[in-house]
Regions:
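Peripheral, non-transmembrane regulatory/ligand-interaction domains of membrane transport proteins
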Residues: 1-177
């Protein structure tokens, strides 16, 4: 990372998988530390659905975007495919556009995951109203609410920081890519 002149403290943040969500501007680059969420596909049949999270770090510099993932994943395969096949004309645009495509993928993940949790909660609440046994529905509802709160804790700090980033006079984000 010496080639990109990434500060030592930023490298520590990248390596700390428990780092809170943040967007931080530096002289030569912008750092975004985010979480992605996905279901545990290796759970036992009798286990409750578990939401796993992984840290993603994006660094936007002059003519480059670096991505760091906590674990190997296919999360950005759609973006890689779009780059290879020039679907969104990403290569002919500035690097801040690539950053916006990556962020759009992460936001899509947030929306679909929240929607899945919401649907599961609705189903459980409906089931709770139609049966009297109670089974373990209360426990499942609590687990889903905890997943929801985990996501909320990671996503809410982004709102304020994202707005601040788009309003800043940062030369790395071009006016055409500010939403």
């Amino acid at each position: 990372c010496s080639h990109f002149e990434i500060d030592f403290l930023v490298l520590q943040d990248i390596l700390n998988a428990d780092h809170p969500t943040k967007i931080e501007e530096h002289d030569k680059y912008i750092v975004l530390i985010l979480k992605i969420f996905y279901p545990n596909e290796h759970k036992e049949e009798d286990e409750l659905d578990e939401l796993l999270q992984q840290q993603v770090c994006l660094i936007l510099g002059n003519n480059y975007v670096l991505t760091f993932l906590e674990k190997e994943t296919d999360f950005f395969d759609d973006v890689s495919s779009a780059l290879r096949n020039d679907v969104l004309k990403i290569r002919s645009r500035q690097t801040d556009y690539l950053l916006s495509v990556l962020l759009n993928s992460i936001m899509g993940n947030y929306i679909s995951t929240i929607s899945s949790i919401d649907d599961a909660l609705e189903d459980l609440e409906e089931e709770l109203l139609t049966i009297t046994s109670g089974d373990d529905i209360g426990i499942q509802i609590q687990a889903l609410r905890r997943q929801y709160m985990l996501m909320k804790k990671s996503i809410l700090p982004l709102k304020e920081q994202y707005i601040k980033l788009l309003r800043a006079e940062n030369l790395l984000i071009h006016k055409v890519n500010r939403a």
